[in-house]
């Protein structure tokens, strides 16, 4: 089941050596963000990739204390999670997601993948389905009794929306040439705590690869899911890591990060959130593998876009320039 990538570790080390330091380089780009701050692997100069029509991009939308990630390439788009952080009837996160997608001219989503059933990941899903043409909806198939999830499943059935359950070992049908989307978790028999399948631990974890660049997207996967992935796959090395569970101490263990060895870490969390995300423990762990100028947080940076042409990758932030001095401070104000 494990797959080997030729000299990936050495490629990443070379990228780190010749990467430019974020915060010192700011390049004006003709793009959505106006200014691009970034790191580039494989080149000695900053090359804006956001507007390269053949590049692949991960967009982490600043939608508050939740998740919504947009994938894009060649004018085709897909959404991973569509959360809502407010109580029903107050739709601030939904509006942030809509504003972002509309600014890019998105009309169709090739797929909507919901990593798990929590409100901060699916609360805006029905609204997304009503507003955009969605090809297929994926989730993990875990039974859940929340009204939000029940309403979603009813909507999918009534509107005859294509729906598929994915588990470890599956591949998402990629709408983009050269892009592979592999499901690493949850396991087929799921992860249980007591008599119930745990919602966070059964998050869909994706390994997205384009050329020599790999993204690891972890939803709210926690320690047991990380242990399962470590025990199942020999190679989970990735260039870009989407931190699990909004930077919670329940995720991003040292052992997991040692296997991933991320160069860039992106964290989705709301400003002044009630959970203290990101917690100090994962920040300490991230700092052992990369530097603050390569760790990005939506509560500080706003929307974050990581773009690759398959060899090089760059990072753009809405609140440019990226302020690395604020990154390694937890949501509770504790500094690494």
What is each PLM-predicted segment?
Residues 2-336:
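Non-globular, low-confidence helical/coil segments that flank catalytic cores
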């Amino acid at each position: 089941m494990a797959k080997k990538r030729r000299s990936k570790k050495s490629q990443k080390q070379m990228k780190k050596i010749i990467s430019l330091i974020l915060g010192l380089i700011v390049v004006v780009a003709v793009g959505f963000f106006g200014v691009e701050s970034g790191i580039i692997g494989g080149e000695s100069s900053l090359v804006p990739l956001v507007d390269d029509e053949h590049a692949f991009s991960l967009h982490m939308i600043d939608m508050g204390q939740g998740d919504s990630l947009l994938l894009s390439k060649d004018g085709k788009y897909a959404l991973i999670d569509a959360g809502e952080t407010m109580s029903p009837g107050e739709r601030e996160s939904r509006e942030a997601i809509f504003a972002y997608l509309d600014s890019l001219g998105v009309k169709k989503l090739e797929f909507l993948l919901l990593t798990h059933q929590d409100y901060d990941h699916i609360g805006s899903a029905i609204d997304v389905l009503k507003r955009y043409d969605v090809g297929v909806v994926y989730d993990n198939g875990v039974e859940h009794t929340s009204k939000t999830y029940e309403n979603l499943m009813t909507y999918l059935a009534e509107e005859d929306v294509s729906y598929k359950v994915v588990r470890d070992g599956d591949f998402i049908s990629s709408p983009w040439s050269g892009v592979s989307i592999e499901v690493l978790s949850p396991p087929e028999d799921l992860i249980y705590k007591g008599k119930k399948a745990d919602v966070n631990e059964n998050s869909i974890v994706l390994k997205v690869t384009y050329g020599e660049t790999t993204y690891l997207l972890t939803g709210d996967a926690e320690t047991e899911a990380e242990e399962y992935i470590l025990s199942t796959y020999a190679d989970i090395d990735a260039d870009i890591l989407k931190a699990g569970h909004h930077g919670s101490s329940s995720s991003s263990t040292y052992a997991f990060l040692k296997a991933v060895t991320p160069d860039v870490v992106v964290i989705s969390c709301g400003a002044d959130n009630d959970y203290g995300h990101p917690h100090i423990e994962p920040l300490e762990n991230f700092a052992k593998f990369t530097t603050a100028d390569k760790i990005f947080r939506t509560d500080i940076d706003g929307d974050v876009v990581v773009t690759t042409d398959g060899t090089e990758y760059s990072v753009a932030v809405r609140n440019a320039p990226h302020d690395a001095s604020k990154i390694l401070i937890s949501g509770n104000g504790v500094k690494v």
